[in-house]
């Protein structure tokens, strides 16, 4: 065993590729017009797609219903691994008003104009006056601050705050200003509500359709997450909330957000506008590291294989970006336009799959395990102690898999935290837990559909035998291999306290 990550990498053999089934990280794909049919969804799943994402910034309820229906039909057509469904909220945002005649108005450098919250200009914007739909902008902004319009295509400096409704600004570059463009206020704390009326309606639509996770846009504080939890209510209590970190406030308040959220998405699009671009990759590494230590799943997203929207092959920089996200510790990576509107959606998923496979085998797993174990706060809870023991036993025994008999997915998540170099086979009767387990690195869900029997120990042995049989049939393990098992002493969630070593 190499004693450092450096020696591990120096001895790394890039030609050694694990079997196709054993990709540890998960791939999320946004479904759009190019991919919203059962045949294409089956192809995407065969290429490696694990989670379907619906972007609620676009599309009607009828359209999103068709995505859900087609995703579920694809599971009937092709069994494969369980498919999870995620709803991505539009989130609270700031936008410009409507220009006169819906025209684009050219803006030269050093051009002075007015930004106003006066509703009289809502549909009467031009190159002299532009309506901004954030009523409190004059209260939070100050002279010298920067305002970005249209994802930073246009930049303005605030000259003065003239009254409760009016800002005077100066353009810092040339461009065009037009209707309904996004507005960013980098370095300014805003007090937008966590949820718009549309977001609330969208989340209720997701609850009704039993989606597995909510990707919550523009999360700034822990209270934002709690507000979403209230909207989910009792009916949606099992839906995972993934907080999208997209602004400086979210970064500043990350520790409190991490305590209450189920997971995190590093959403680098808006984040790269809100904070200086050279800082984004460092913030990405920091947030992923914090999630890894807290055993919270983390997704890396935005422009990962962007050029594959129109080209059959990505740039080398994009491939490196995906690989480095995996090396940073991301549990999942996400595709947006590449699968929603791109010309090569299946190829994009396949490229991401192969890139993740290669990156995963470059990780120095023993060193990572020792580091994570040394940083865990003591004393650990019983379930986490069992997770550490299982991973340690897998190394000592040269085991080929860790089988976790789970009710809620907690035990599998904690084993995943310690990043074993063998697959974690999660056996559960809980279909929802199986599907959102795609959020956890290295977890492969197996849905055990036989009814529970009264004799607990016999029920445990039945599930274990079935899981081993399935894993052998899939080629994950072979007859005679050592495997480590994690199980509970009684029924219910949170009772895992037994680690065993058995032969397949």
Swiss-Prot record:
GO terms for cellular component: cell surface; cytoplasm; hyphal cell wall; plasma membrane; yeast-form cell wall. It comes from the Eukaryota. The record marks 244 as: Transition state stabilizer. K(+) binds at residues 55, 57, 88-89. Its EC number is 2.7.1.40. It is found in: Cytoplasm. Pathway: Carbohydrate degradation; glycolysis; pyruvate from D-glyceraldehyde 3-phosphate: step 5/5. Mg(2+) binds at residues 246, 270. Its cofactor is Mg(2+); K(+). The keyword Metal-binding applies. Keywords: ATP-binding, Cytoplasm, Glycolysis, Kinase, Magnesium, Metal-binding, Nucleotide-binding, Pyruvate, Transferase. It catalyses: pyruvate + ATP = phosphoenolpyruvate + ADP + H(+). Transmembrane segments: none annotated. It is an enzyme of class 2 (transferase). InterPro entries: Pyr_Knase, Pyrv/PenolPyrv_kinase-like_dom, Pyrv_kinase-like_dom_sf, Pyrv_Knase-like_insert_dom_sf, Pyrv_Knase_AS, Pyrv_Knase_brl, Pyrv_Knase_C, Pyrv_Knase_C_sf. Homotetramer. Has antigenic properties. Belongs to the pyruvate kinase family. This is Pyruvate kinase. It comes from Candida albicans (strain SC5314 / ATCC MYA-2876). The lineage of its organism: Eukaryota, Fungi, Dikarya, Ascomycota, Saccharomycotina.
